[in-house]
């Protein structure tokens, strides 16, 4: 899955996405995580799972 697709999916789940300097800041019901900003690249599965776990979406 591309990072841009994952970002759109997170936003559809209600995650607030804000731009950082070299990354995206993710917030969901008081939980926070970050994601590198490379929209054309594939997101690695361990990183995707870690972000979901940190946000409580897994």
Curated annotation (Swiss-Prot):
Inducers of expression: Induced by amino acid starvation, carbon starvation and when translation is blocked. Induction no longer occurs in the absence of Lon protease suggesting, by homology to other toxin-antitoxin systems, that it may degrade the HicB antitoxin. A member of the hicA-hicB operon.
Alphabetized InterPro entries for the sequence: HicA_mRNA_interferase (IPR012933), HicA_sf (IPR038570)
EC number(s) on file: 3.1.-.-
Keywords: Endonuclease, Hydrolase, Nuclease, RNA-binding, Stress response, Toxin-antitoxin system
Domain of life assignment: Bacteria
Pfam families: HicA_toxin
Cellular compartments per GO CC: toxin-antitoxin complex
Annotated GO biological process: mRNA catabolic process; regulation of DNA-templated transcription; regulation of growth
GO molecular function: mRNA binding; RNA endonuclease activity
Role this protein plays: Toxic component of a type II toxin-antitoxin (TA) system. A probable translation-independent mRNA interferase. Overexpression causes cessation of cell growth and inhibits cell proliferation via inhibition of translation; this blockage is overcome (after 90 minutes) by subsequent expression of antitoxin HicB. Overexpression causes cleavage of a number of mRNAs and tmRNA, in a translation-independent fashion, suggesting this is an mRNA interferase.
Assembly and interaction partners: Probably forms a complex with the antitoxin HicB which inhibits the mRNA interferase activity.
Family in the record: Belongs to the HicA mRNA interferase family.
This protein's name: Probable mRNA interferase toxin HicA
């Amino acid at each position: 899955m591309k990072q841009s697709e994952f970002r759109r999916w997170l936003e559809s789940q209600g995650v607030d996405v804000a731009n950082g300097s070299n990354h995206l800041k993710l917030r969901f019901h008081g939980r926070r995580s970050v994601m590198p900003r490379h929209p054309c690249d594939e997101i690695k599965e361990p990183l995707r799972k870690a972000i979901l776990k940190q946000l409580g979406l897994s």
